[in-house]
A protein has these predicted regions:
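Gram-negative/organellar outer-membrane beta-barrel architecture
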Residues: 10, 15-209, 290-300, 309-317, ...
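C-terminal outer-membrane beta-barrel translocator/porin domains of Gram-negative envelope proteins
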Residues: 63, 196-201, 205-328
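Short glycine-rich beta-strand segments
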Residues: 127-131, 171-175, 220-228, 275-279, ...
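Small/polar, glycine/serine/threonine/aspartate-rich low-complexity segments that form flexible
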Residues: 62-74, 280-282, 345-356
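Extended hydrophobic-aromatic, low-complexity segments
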Residues: 2-3, 283, 314, 328-335, ...
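A generic beta-sheet turn/junction motif
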Residues: 263, 366-370, 381-383
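Acidic/histidine-rich, surface-exposed loop or edge segments in extracytoplasmic proteins
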Residues: 2-12
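C-terminal hydrophobic structural anchor segments
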Residues: 322-358
Length: 396
């Protein structure tokens, strides 16, 4: 509506605006994703003031998307998305996304803009994931289990501008492990807990895929309340009911991405990831999974050189540098090197992890209609193995 557009920019009559100020206001309105195109012109008046004329093209209120995705970890899947704006309440967005394939995933979300300039947003959402996850022992496949994950989430965010959001929220999480092929150490059972958190999100990337400049920050400080574990440990040669801690604990999650152009075709990449559970000794089912190049599921710390779930750790910090070169239009070659530190705050009572890991990856990418085709070769100094990694399309 006209009112929402004017309010989203905080545009007022009989005010003085500079060209830079108008540009920032237009970017704020674009950040709501309600508009496909916003252009403006100035019409001089006889009293030395101007009328501002806006030419605005709105996005459809309802639209559907269909995509295909393949990854060696998650398999092949079709991704279906339906998004509607202002369906239940004005100034809102509702979406439902399905991932149908070798692993089933579901997400639903309602976002409600609040305030005159829509700088507050209240979000209610739910998500369900089901994965078949390979376990590893000494860097080799040793088992397979089903992981089911369900969460209900509510949060309130405040945007100082469309690039920076801070807020608070709470979520309920339910996790179930069911071994299919038991390894030397497996959990079987379920756990659930409530988490309250404070978050900061910033995104100044010039484009969502293969940006050349900008930063992206996702930071979260959590407090995990009492857990409700109903779990049995299968540990060769016996199975036992271990004593699990249900004590509350704090945790921090952090992800930083930076892109800096070098010449006409080059880009320097930098990435810092951290996941830390404090006072996490006999607690379970909230460790951080180490491995993989593509972020796919909760509590994942990507690492060039290892497959998803090679290690699980309660305290992880990863540092990565890379260089991406655009060979031709939509064709890229990317080199990455990373180092990862474990066990520097909390140490798991159930998982054995090396204190330091280092690895490398070389990726060829062709960006086409279905999304990026990424073929990688990875190497880890500790495993001393070269492994391949393939990702096609944009993940769930």
């Amino acid at each position: 509506t006209k009112e929402f557009f004017v309010h989203s920019m905080d545009l007022r009559t009989n005010h003085y605006y500079t060209p830079d100020g108008l540009a920032r206001m237009v970017r704020k309105a674009s950040g709501t994703r309600y508009y496909n195109r916003i252009a403006y012109s100035l019409q001089p008046l006889t009293d030395s003031t101007c009328n501002i004329l806006f030419d605005v093209t709105e996005n459809p209120l309802t639209f559907a998307k269909i995509g295909l995705h393949y990854n060696e970890f998650s398999g092949i899947s079709a991704i279906l998305n339906l998004t509607n704006r202002d369906f239940f309440i004005p100034n809102s967005r509702d979406l439902v996304t399905l991932n149908i394939g070798e692993n089933f995933r579901f997400r639903a979300e309602h976002l409600q803009y609040l305030g005159r300039i829509s700088n507050f947003a209240f979000t209610l959402g739910t998500q369900f994931d089901q994965f078949n996850i390979t376990t590893y022992n000494n860097y080799k496949e040793s088992g397979l289990y089903d992981q089911s994950y369900l969460k209900f989430d509510g949060k309130l965010g405040y945007s100082t501008n469309r690039n920076l959001t801070i807020g608070i929220g709470s979520r309920f999480e339910w996790i179930k492990y069911n071994p299919n092929i038991a390894s030397s150490l497996e959990f079987e059972g379920k756990n659930n807990f409530l988490t309250s958190y404070f978050f900061i999100r910033q995104n100044t990337l010039d484009k969502p895929s293969y940006p050349k400049r900008g930063i992206k920050i996702d930071a979260e400080a959590d407090w995990v309340y009492t857990q409700n574990a109903d779990v049995v440990v299968h540990q060769t040669p016996t199975s036992l009911d271990s004593v699990f801690s249900e004590d509350p604990y704090g945790r921090v999650l952090f992800n930083f991405e930076s892109y800096s152009p070098v010449g006409r075709r080059g880009t320097i990449l930098a990435n810092i990831q951290a996941g830390i559970n404090f006072n996490y000794q006999n607690n379970i089912m909230n460790e951080f999974s180490i491995g993989g190049l593509t972020p796919l599921f909760h509590n994942e710390i990507t690492f060039a050189g290892l497959r998803e779930g090679t290690f699980y750790s309660p305290s992880v910090a990863e540092f990565r540098l890379g260089y991406r070169y655009q060979m031709f239009t939509n064709t890229y070659l990317t080199a990455r090197a990373n180092i990862l530190f474990n066990n520097f705050i909390s140490t798991s009572s159930f998982f054995i992890n090396p204190d330091v890991l280092s690895g490398y990856a070389l990726t060829f990418t062709y960006n086409f209609a279905l999304g990026p085709l990424e073929v990688s070769a990875m190497y880890c100094d500790q495993s001393r193995r070269v492994i391949g990694y393939v990702n096609i399309g944009i993940p769930f």
